[in-house]
Amino acid sequence: MRVSSALLQKAAKTVDKYSLYVPKSGVFPKGFKVASLASGVKKNGNRDLGIILNTNKSRPSNAAAVFTTNRFKAAPVLVSKQVLDGSSGEGVNAIVANSGCANAVTGELGMQDAQKVAGQVNAHIGKENSTLVMSTGVIGQRLQMDKISKGINTLFDQKQFGSDFNSWLNLAKSICTTDTFPKLISSKFQLSDGTEYTLTGISKGAGMICPNMATLLGFIVTDLPIKASTLQAMLTAAVNRSFNCISVDGDMSTNDTICMLANGAVDTFVIDEASPDFEQVKSQVTEFAKQLAQLVVRDGEGATKFVTVNVKNSANFKDARIIAETISNSMLVKSALYGQDANWGRILCAIGYSKLENLASLDESKINVSFIATDNSSPRELKLIANGVPQFDIDENRASEILALPDLEILVDMGTGSEECQFWTCDLSHEYVTINGDYRS
């Protein structure tokens, strides 16, 4: 039995995502301090300006970033790319981010504004070409430079930087727009010799989520010493398995950026691609990035479900990814998930029109499709298609139970190889239209 849309909307609104996903404490990398405030850019008076600083005096931090491939790249994206290109990722000691205004499609004046923001932070820390700039908010509006400039000066002049939990949480809040909760995670890890290091991640995003070689806005910082070129390779690999595998609505922003700073405050050898711990650290960063990316989907605008789309036993990874992404972006699939309708035909249709690189990846006689319950209830797997044959006698009651879960999985077994890709998506509700229908107001 399907639940009425009115009840579904009510359920979505009553889920307290803040309590579920926002930590109450954390561990943070050595040698970083952060600050944030309400500069007045946001109409609601919430925090809208934040800065991350490397305060490790013994070593400048290295940086890496992955940016949107949208042709209308925002001014802060272009300025940050210039900083990284000019420094080769070395000696980048700060990130400044604002919310409420994207500074996108603002022409040469927008570029000048972004450069002034970076230059102002550079002047405060006494280093040139050392600051990355990030912005999020409404496209087509210039930064209110008087408010941003005053806010930056206030943070430095009043020495508002801290390394405690509240400082980091407030930083996460300062980049939120339509987010229902700030996204902050942190964890300690060990190298093979027992040396401990820390990763902290912050991201924002709830809509305009369908990245390609980038993400929404996100920072990952660590106190490990990592060679700049290695850091870039590590971040790119992590993003390809995390932030490039999420979808809320199929839209790719003009401002999508994820960056990583490594300041070497932990006293250990510099990690490069020849280091014995390289693969371990790379794997840890990737798994950490997956956790951070999944929070964005959990906060999808109006979403009531978090859905893992798992495509396995594919002839190659690229086609597994293409199929997972196509299912995740399908408005019909997402609408069926919201309505708790076991309409497997929409899933199969999405698989069928996927633009595969190798047609041999899809053999209609070998494909299996299932719904998977994630709450340990039984039966865990509900088979919808078995070796290309529809299961006409599926248990509709069990299907409704699985589709009513806040977390569930769509499993697609291609039967043509051994490669696997996971995508994370959400359903599409009436609330999504409401939120985006009056975003500028």
From Swiss-Prot:
Pfam family membership, one: ArgJ
PTM note: The alpha and beta chains are autoproteolytically processed from a single precursor protein within the mitochondrion.
Compartments in which it is found: Mitochondrion matrix
Reaction catalyzed: N(2)-acetyl-L-ornithine + L-glutamate = N-acetyl-L-glutamate + L-ornithine; L-glutamate + acetyl-CoA = N-acetyl-L-glutamate + CoA + H(+)
EC number from the UniProt entry: 2.3.1.35, 2.3.1.1
GO (cellular component) term, any one: mitochondrial matrix
Protein residues bound to substrate: T177, K204, T215, E301, N436, S441
Site (Involved in the stabilization of negative charge on the oxyanion by the formation of the oxyanion hole): T136, G137
GO MF annotation: an example: L-glutamate N-acetyltransferase activity
Domain of life according to the entry: Eukaryota
Keywords: Acyltransferase, Amino-acid biosynthesis, Arginine biosynthesis, Autocatalytic cleavage, Mitochondrion, Multifunctional enzyme, Transferase
Enzyme class: transferase
Pathway in which the depicted protein is active: Amino-acid biosynthesis; L-arginine biosynthesis; L-ornithine and N-acetyl-L-glutamate from L-glutamate and N(2)-acetyl-L-ornithine (cyclic): step 1/1; Amino-acid biosynthesis; L-arginine biosynthesis; N(2)-acetyl-L-ornithine from L-glutamate: step 1/4
More about this protein: This protein may be expected to contain an N-terminal transit peptide but none has been predicted.
HAMAP family assigned to the protein according to its UniProt record, in alphabetical order: ArgJ (MF_01106)
Protein family: Belongs to the ArgJ family.
Subunit structure: Heterodimer of an alpha and a beta chain.
Protein known as: Arginine biosynthesis bifunctional protein ArgJ, mitochondrial
Protein species of origin: Lachancea thermotolerans (strain ATCC 56472 / CBS 6340 / NRRL Y-8284)
